[in-house]
Amino acid sequence: MPKLRSATSTEGRNMAGARALWRATGVKDNDFGKPIIAIANSFTQFVPGHVHLKDMGSLVASAIEEAGGIAKEFNTIAVDDGIAMGHGGMLYSLPSRELIADSVEYMVNAHCADALVCISNCDKITPGMLMAALRLNIPVVFVSGGPMEAGKTKLSDKLIKLDLVDAMVAGADSNVSDEDSAKIERSACPTCGSCSGMFTANSMNCLTEALGLSLPGNGSMLATHADRRELFLEAGRRVMALAKRYYHQDDESALPRNIANFKAFENAMTLDIAMGGSSNTVLHLLAAAQEADVDFTMADIDRMSRLVPHLCKVAPSTPKYHMEDVHRAGGVMGILGELDRAGLLHTDVFHVAADNDGTPGSGTLKSVLAQYDVMQTQDEKVKHFFMAGPAGIPTTKAFSQDCRWPSLDNDRQEGCIRSREFAFSQEGGLAVLSGNVAENGCIVKTAGVDESNLTFVGSARVYESQDDAVAGILGGEVVAGDVVVIRYEGPKGGPGMQEMLYPTSYLKSRGLGKACALITDGRFSGGTSGLSIGHVSPEAAAGGTIALIENGDRIEIDIPKRSIKLAVSDVELNARREKMHSLGPMAWKPIGRQRYVSLALKAYAMLATSADKGAVRDRSKLED
């Protein structure tokens, strides 16, 4: 029977000092011997997805203590990618993922916690905590802050839904009046919560449901809705149940590595492809798989992208649907239910929402779907749960409203979530491309690509940084038919693998959204749409071919064939590579780029791998 990890610091005379310190935190004599449950919160006043999390730890703690545990909360950092966008702050976003993972590991291991609840929400926080949870492999439950309500405003006597990207595009479009731009800006982000579309934050919070590590509704229930309160309380109860199963019953199915196994990662990626999730999720799933010692790679993603249909189309891929609409249609469980009926899901994997009593099928995703898939459940409480909707009242307070949709969206032919027969497309919303530009692959969010752009041939317009590309786009250098190439923005070359939301938004604002393509060894915001190809691997700084592209080179993109090709002969490419090598210390570095890189970022860059490895640390450099 496993011994409580916390016994290391609470048992024996030699731990008298540690017990004295535990007492100073409020632990009583009769508490010693109870499991200590760490609560990793990410409250901050910098991020709308996190401004309402201050009291969430107390909610979780109350449920833990009622169930017989000791709850101890700590905080991690949280970077807002939208606020950090378009300037040097974005260099810190992806590296913060590793910092968050390390900080959770440090706190949990330093204090010998027995189990963990992760209160996350936005872009790098959920992935960072996920990496830590799989690294630690102690009982864990994830509960996020939830998505914000979609913005709404009236323009030309028409009510339209909005999000952050609409504000950015309007602000850069000279054809939009100052008055209309201001209306959009003030209406785009009306409440607390993660941005309202299927951007990175919401994509990752949905994927934790598919991985089996969070409760149904975690990815889709609005931050403002009163029903979300129960998710925090249930997270506390569930983590205690998992801890008891592991420490009292020696049930290893309660551990995250036995829940988030290879099949669960396939489920998560299947969901991601079906819902057209952010391309960043590929980066984060690959990183999490490495922490879990799961052999899940770009090759698996490529294979699955050819099999999984696109069942759910959400902003930024369409202005019609946001996360509040996904929830009304049954949330993640609704999408998983359709995937199951299409024969594309592993339902025999364990899930934290299911009790494992030892009987066949218990504790698995199959039993969770039977209860929470709105197309098969007979539970009226579940149907009521998924009818939770927006109030349309600007607020930064959680649980501030209890509005309901008049009905569920069960229309699987023309609704927000479709059955396989009526899919938005029979190929999913993400694809892996490869070719001489990206020998180890690159990613495109096909959900956001217009059908007319599935194949594209154009001339390279090369920039050594995102800043130069933005200046070139706004300055009129980029014209229809160009393939904008932004390089030296990968994990090592940036460093930090910046998001390219401004270049793609500015292309749209200049009417070039469908007339140009963009490829980069950087990445894209979850809010990006259009022919935007990122994660080119190897990156320029690691000797990738993207560093050898010259202005005017012909680039051929064929998404149906999963191909991206630089139409330059091997002889010429080899000559360019030799010329690059001849530069010595200046080889594989951006020409003329002026950028301050701090010591912290330089330390990150020294160990960073390319995107096809999840941009995690190169373990070979850390081995004894």
From Swiss-Prot:
Reactions the enzyme catalyzes: (2R)-2,3-dihydroxy-3-methylbutanoate = 3-methyl-2-oxobutanoate + H2O; (2R,3R)-2,3-dihydroxy-3-methylpentanoate = (S)-3-methyl-2-oxopentanoate + H2O
N6-carboxylysine modification, residue list: 124
Gene Ontology biological-process entries: isoleucine biosynthetic process; L-valine biosynthetic process
UniProt entry keywords in alphabetical sequence: 2Fe-2S, Amino-acid biosynthesis, Branched-chain amino acid biosynthesis, Iron, Iron-sulfur, Lyase, Magnesium, Metal-binding
Cofactor(s), by name: [2Fe-2S] cluster; Mg(2+)
Tagged with keyword Ribonucleoprotein: no
Family annotation (InterPro entries): Dihydro-acid_dehy_C (IPR042096), DihydroxyA_deHydtase (IPR004404), DiOHA_6PGluconate_deHydtase_CS (IPR020558), ILV_EDD_C (IPR056740), ILV_EDD_N (IPR000581), IlvD/EDD_N (IPR037237)
Pathway: Amino-acid biosynthesis; L-isoleucine biosynthesis; L-isoleucine from 2-oxobutanoate: step 3/4; Amino-acid biosynthesis; L-valine biosynthesis; L-valine from pyruvate: step 3/4
Cofactor note: Binds 1 [2Fe-2S] cluster per subunit. This cluster acts as a Lewis acid cofactor.
GO cellular component, one term: cytosol
GO function term, MF aspect, one: magnesium ion binding
Annotated residues for binding of [2Fe-2S] cluster: 122, 195
Binding residues annotated for Mg(2+), in chain numbering: 81, 123-124, 499
EC number(s) reported in the record: 4.2.1.9
Origin: domain of life: Bacteria
Pfam families in the record: ILV_EDD_C (PF24877), ILVD_EDD_N (PF00920)
Residues at the active site: 525 (proton acceptor)
Subunit description: Homodimer.
Role according to the record: Functions in the biosynthesis of branched-chain amino acids. Catalyzes the dehydration of (2R,3R)-2,3-dihydroxy-3-methylpentanoate (2,3-dihydroxy-3-methylvalerate) into 2-oxo-3-methylpentanoate (2-oxo-3-methylvalerate) and of (2R)-2,3-dihydroxy-3-methylbutanoate (2,3-dihydroxyisovalerate) into 2-oxo-3-methylbutanoate (2-oxoisovalerate), the penultimate precursor to L-isoleucine and L-valine, respectively.
Similarity field: Belongs to the IlvD/Edd family.
NCBIfam families: ilvD, PRK12448.1
The protein's name: Dihydroxy-acid dehydratase
Species assigned in the record: Shewanella baltica (strain OS223)
Gene name as annotated: ilvD
